[in-house]
Amino acid sequence: LAQGLQNGLILDHIGASLRRILFALLLAAPPAWALGLMAGRIKLAETLLSPIMYLLHPLPKVAFLPILMLLLGLGDGSKIALMGLVVFGQLFMAARDSAKAIAPPLVDSVRSLGCRSWGIFRWVIAPATLPSLISALRVSLGTSIAVLFLSETFASMDGLGWYIMDAWSRVNYPDMYAAILALALLGLSLYLILDALESLALRWREVG
């Protein structure tokens, strides 16, 4: 691993994998949260969206990889979309369920103080759903890394998944183990960053 870091080779593959993970999170998390909140608070939205999620969510996301490759090509697009499907489904379910679980008297009490729809979302719904959302994001992050490894072994020339399989096929076990360690450290770094963001976003839980 140290040798790969020194010559910069493994850094290129770490960068490729990290780029795909971050793009998938940035593209999937905001709409998943927004639509999940809508489904949790608006009956019509739940009626329209929940059956679709019930149909698609149980399917193994890797089953969509051939379809995504046909539609988006063999580049980053199909890999990012595959991870995005993983993130979207889990965050949508978490946001919807946590929004539905908010006690109506809590919302009514805030509304009685003159708080309008945006204020209710800002001060009640969003904070109440954030803990579940971050927990789901933590789970989906691990699943996304596993899916990333699989997707990078198909028609790819970079990324830690490709590097691991390439080293294995060349019987270069030191490089293979170095790439596996790099993938584990990448996941650890992302989890630590998520923990730090959780502490910042949920500081109100420590009050009192």
Per-segment meaning from a language model:
Residues 7, 11, 15, 45-49, ...:
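Alpha-helical membrane-protein architecture signal
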Residues 23-53:
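Transmembrane-helix boundary motif in ABC transporter permease subunits
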Residues 81-85, 117-150, 178, 182-183, ...:
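Transmembrane alpha-helices
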Residues 94-139, 160, 164:
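Short cytoplasmic-facing helical segments at TM-TM junctions of multi-pass membrane proteins
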